[in-house]
């Protein structure tokens, strides 16, 4: 009883939560507003998808269109991530009560009722889907895939040792970004698939390393995950996924007709950022893995977009100067 009483008094003062009114804080916790890593991982594929489509398109895409789609897809990803977190906590509330790291979440500690959380979650999904009204019709199918897997994810740890594989749906942001710009993914099927494999490997790699912090308690409770299933070879799997992501990014650029700036900045920045993350996280252990992943994601994302941005700028320059003998290779 003392533990429950203490949890109910729990009022975190970290990150953005410190700026929220006391009554709103539990809802901020429910959507992980103080956990920036998840928002990076969900939003960066859309940002890269927009930049990649712009850099590899046969025709010059207007900057105002790119910014419009970037804003809409960023909002969509932020809201979907929030709704997914709330849904995950609703489904996992009984498990969360048994894991020390999650006992202080708002539902296990009783800061929000299940009925209030359910209504809040439904409103988030409706709000996110309302943004689809401003996007091409093809994006409805893409969004349906994303929502389906967001709803499925919390059940994965009950039935499979590989629930992280459900997270690869995040990579579907690439074809959704292409559709949002009026481009057909099938016209660049190989390069598009490489970019999807790239993000899939990144997502699973980070979640695999991040999940190690709960391995001992997951074993006791019976929660399944790749970190539990492969607990004796996590390092090998993590580096393998890192290699796959690096190669997939490289091939995605080459097949899309991208050149030196992409290889130097996007691929090079990815390798440096996540090599740093893996070395630090796998040597130091689970403690502090979130902050290391967050900084590495930020560094890598900046370089992913920088390389693609330079490619787009060069393509625009060539399109605007048709007399230039240098032709874009697409």
Swiss-Prot record:
Transmembrane segments: 116-136, 165-185, 189-209, 238-258, 260-280
Example GO biological process: terpenoid biosynthetic process
Annotated compartments: Membrane
Cofactor: Mg(2+)
UniProt keywords, alphabetically: Magnesium, Membrane, Transferase, Transmembrane, Transmembrane helix
Gene Ontology CC, one term: mitochondrial inner membrane
Lineage top rank: taxon: Eukaryota
Key word Iron present: no
Phenotype upon loss of function: Impairs the synthesis of austinol and dehydroaustinol and accumulates the intermediate compound 3,5-dimethylorsellinic acid.
Membrane topology listed for this record: Multi-pass membrane protein
Coiled-coil annotated spans: none
Predominant cellular place of this UniProt entry's protein: membrane
Gene3D superfamilies, alphabetized: UbiA prenyltransferase
Enzyme Commission designation: 2.5.1.-
The protein's annotated pathway: Secondary metabolite biosynthesis; terpenoid biosynthesis
Catalytic activity: 3,5-dimethylorsellinate + (2E,6E)-farnesyl diphosphate = (3R)-3-farnesyl-6-hydroxy-2,3,5-trimethyl-4-oxocyclohexa-1,5-diene-1-carboxylate + diphosphate + H(+)
Any one Gene Ontology molecular-function term assigned to this protein's record: 4-hydroxybenzoate polyprenyltransferase activity
More details: In A.calidoustus, the austinoid gene cluster lies on a contiguous DNA region, while clusters from E.nidulans and P.brasilianum are split in their respective genomes. Genetic rearrangements provoked variability among the clusters and E.nidulans produces the least number of austionoid derivatives with the end products austinol and dehydroaustinol, while P.brasilianum can produce until acetoxydehydroaustin, and A.calidoustus produces the highest number of identified derivatives.
Its biological purpose: Polyprenyl transferase; part of the gene cluster B that mediates the biosynthesis of austinol and dehydroaustinol, two fungal meroterpenoids. The first step of the pathway is the synthesis of 3,5-dimethylorsellinic acid by the polyketide synthase ausA. 3,5-dimethylorsellinic acid is then prenylated by the polyprenyl transferase ausN. Further epoxidation by the FAD-dependent monooxygenase ausM and cyclization by the probable terpene cyclase ausL lead to the formation of protoaustinoid A.
Family according to the record: Belongs to the UbiA prenyltransferase family.
Protein name per the record: Polyprenyl transferase ausN
Species per Swiss-Prot/TrEMBL record: Emericella nidulans (strain FGSC A4 / ATCC 38163 / CBS 112.46 / NRRL 194 / M139)
Chain's gene name: ausN
